[in-house]
């Protein structure tokens, strides 16, 4: 699938005070290590908290819907997974990965909204200004947008920094099959929110 807009963004769309309040709220929760179908520190090293807060969904949904339409993707989505609050401190990272895959959630999943569906749209919200940390770049790879389901990227040739995400309150929306990573943080702390919108498998 070749896209005209591999990602869509809204600069400083979330007010600073809301970003600050979210950081304050979720850093008070007990976090756990982020996983990739099981703990694997070679792929991922970050701390996460998951939330079903209705206010988060209400905040995120309009950006997802607008990006899905304005970017011309028009993906069939009908449910959003639990929102993830992520914290990256020094030496933490998330290596190359895709959020989506060809394998749908099982039909017996405890959440009815997940059953038989796959991740189609990923949304990332920057809660920290880039001046507060070093490293921690959010990068995408456009070398092969059709590489859905592969386990790793080899001979990466088309990496791009998503500079917009170094601005606090910026929202970036992209198809879940886009390869992306967060480079190691070398100083400071990077906070973000991530959500995934799901729908029936590709036809």
Residue ranges and their predicted role:
Residues 1-173, 177-203:
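Fe(II)/2-oxoglutarate oxygenase catalytic core
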């Amino acid at each position: 699938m070749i896209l005209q807009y591999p990602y869509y963004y809204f600069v400083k769309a979330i007010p600073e005070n809301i970003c600050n309040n979210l950081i304050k709220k979720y850093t008070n929760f007990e976090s756990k290590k982020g996983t990739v179908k099981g703990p694997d520190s070679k792929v991922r090293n970050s701390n996460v908290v998951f939330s079903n807060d209705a206010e988060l969904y209400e905040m995120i949904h309009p950006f997802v819907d607008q990006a899905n339409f304005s970017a011309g993707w028009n993906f069939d989505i009908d449910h959003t997974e639990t929102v993830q609050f992520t914290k990256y401190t020094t030496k933490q990272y998330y290596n190359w990965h895709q959020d989506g895959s060809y394998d749908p959630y099982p039909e017996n999943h405890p959440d009815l909204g997940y059953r038989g569906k796959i991740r189609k749209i990923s949304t990332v919200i920057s809660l920290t200004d880039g001046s507060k940390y070093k490293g921690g770049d959010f990068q995408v790879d456009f070398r092969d947008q059709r590489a859905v389901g592969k386990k790793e990227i080899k001979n990466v040739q088309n990496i791009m920094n998503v500079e917009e995400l170094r601005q606090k309150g910026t929202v970036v929306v992209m198809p879940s099959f886009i390869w992306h990573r967060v480079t190691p943080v070398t100083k400071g702390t990077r906070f973000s929110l991530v959500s995934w919108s799901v729908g029936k498998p590709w036809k």
